[in-house]
A protein has these predicted regions:
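Conserved, mostly hydrophobic/aromatic
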Residues: 61, 73, 101, 114, ...
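Conserved beta-strand positions in the central sheet of alpha/beta enzyme cores
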Residues: 72, 102, 156-159, 195, ...
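Acidic-and-aromatic substrate-binding clefts and catalytic sites of carbohydrate-active enzymes
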Residues: 79-83, 104-112, 132-139, 166, ...
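Beta/alpha (TIM)-barrel catalytic core signal, keyed to glycine-rich beta->alpha loops juxtaposed to Asp/Glu
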Residues: 24, 163-337
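Active-site groove signature of glycoside hydrolases
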Residues: 150-168
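Active-site mouth loops of central-metabolism enzymes
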Residues: 74-84, 130-137, 266-274
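Short, acidic/polar
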Residues: 80-93, 136-150, 199-206, 279-282
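N-terminal binding-site loop/beta-alpha segment at the start of enzyme catalytic domains
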Residues: 12-125, 187
Length: 337
């Protein structure tokens, strides 16, 4: 557990350094001309919603025709769990109405634990996976291994994982790049939809300009949005293209302060929101935008809180929007544009 956590945290810190070190002016007119999405009270235009008493709300996923639960299950929740615990956590999520599960090879043993636990429910859920491999050969190898680990013949969504720089974009979309695997696998029936996750505005905007993706997985968070101007331009473009919008970091407070005790949340490389009031605020902010689903942190306790609180979310009114903005401006956002 300790060695993986150290490696996981180190890798994410490295990713953030790359964003800062390689950030450069991004000359795509859309990035500078698309305005931020107006802050509601509620901006869910274009989203179809389904509600069933006692279950999580479901929302439409862009142009895919799929309906996903507003809370997704991140594979890190079962990382290092026993098989019995993994099955229990999956069952808990299913019983709450979760039908969206997301995993990646970089999440330690999560695939190996999640695959058997999900097998009885496979036909009823939407399964997403990702690869950090940028080449055709590497991504094909990782795709086939992930399918084997997850005990499935196909993924509903396969994503380019953590795309950070324009060099990443050029490589994965270029000759011999990972996109060649994605397109071949879609023809083979091994993946249904193609998406990406990103942690930089420039990479996200570049990808959306150069390929017709089905989905985007991106940090849409009250603090990064208001204090970092990180997210509005990406969401506006994704909505314009009728992409399925999936959210990371809805429950992030910001970077861990220097010297902070992180022992209570070893799977969180950022400081999470932990009180019921703050978690509710974070989820309400993110899900009041045209977001289909939010993936909570991989910590089991926080995931359970998200499941509980997401059943009773109400739209934000303008007074609350203003209050959240003031709160965000007092803190340090996890990402900045």
């Amino acid at each position: 557990m300790k060695s993986f956590t150290t490696s996981f945290t180190t890798g994410l810190k490295s990713l953030l350094r790359r964003i800062e070190m390689k950030r450069r002016k991004f000359i795509i007119s859309a990035a500078s001309t698309i305005p931020a999405i107006t802050l509601f009270p509620s901006d869910l235009s274009g989203i179809t919603r389904e509600t069933v008493r006692g279950k999580l709300e479901k929302r439409s996923l862009g142009k895919t025709g799929e309906m996903l639960s507003v809370i997704g299950f991140g594979g890190i929740v079962v990382m290092n769990a026993t098989p019995d615990d993994a099955s229990a956590r999956v069952r808990m999520a299913i019983d709450a109405g979760v039908n969206y599960f997301d995993v990646a090879p970089s999440y330690g043993d999560a695939e190996i634990k999640l695959g058997p636990a999900l097998e009885p429910f496979r036909k009823d859920i939407f399964l997403a996976c990702k690869t950090t491999e940028r080449t055709k050969e590497g991504s094909r190898r990782e795709l086939e291994q992930s399918l084997k680990n997850m005990r499935t013949e196909h993924f509903d969504l396969y994503q380019h994982h953590a795309v950070t720089t324009l060099e990443d974009v050029d490589t994965l979309l270029g000759p011999g790049g990972a996109m060649e695997t994605f397109l071949e696998a879609r023809k083979e029936g091994k993946i249904r939809f193609i998406g990406f996750s990103a942690h930089s505005v420039e990479a996200a905007m570049a990808l959306m300009e150069r390929f017709e993706f089905d989905t985007i997985l991106f940090p849409f968070n009250y603090a990064t949005w208001n204090a970092g101007n990180f997210g509005p331009q990406v969401m506006a473009r994704a909505k314009e293209k009728n992409m399925g919008i999936l959210a990371l970091k809805a429950m992030a407070k910001g970077p861990w302060p220097d010297g902070a005790d992180r022992s209570a949340f070893p799977k969180c490389w950022y400081e999470p929101l932990i009180t019921e009031e703050d978690i509710t605020m974070g989820l309400r902010f993110t899900l009041s935008h045209p977001v289909t689903a939010a993936i909570p942190p991989g910590d089991e306790k926080l995931f359970k809180q998200a499941l509980s609180l997401a059943h009773n979310l109400k739209p934000l009114d303008q007074k609350e929007v203003n209050s959240i903005r003031e709160k965000a401006l007092k803190g340090v956002p996890l990402f900045k544009s």
